[in-house]
Amino acid sequence: MPLSVRSAGLIRALIYPVQFDDNPLEAVDRVIDTVVRTRSLDATPEEYRSGIREALTSADRLSDLIPQDHSDDVIRRYLAEVARRIEVASAQ
């Protein structure tokens, strides 16, 4: 199933800040602080987590959502870590 327009937008918002980073996994906290916690795109943390879940189960190449050099595997690992940290924060 292709990624919904809303989820694609949320994923773009999460990828954009790390497109030039050498290792996106090192930027997870920064992105959560600047994108998720500020409710960028009027989305709640749960909406971001849901969008990530949808993205990770889709067959779409997530690395193609915005022009950048990271592999699809790197982007998927990064998004999985963002989702994990959102979940940890929501459980506290």
Language-model segments: residues:
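Extended alpha-helical scaffolding segments
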Residues: 31-72
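Alpha-helix boundary/N-cap detector
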Residues: 2, 23-26, 43, 47, ...
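Amphipathic alpha-helical binding modules
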Residues: 64-92
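Short terminal alpha-helical segments
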Residues: 1-33, 83
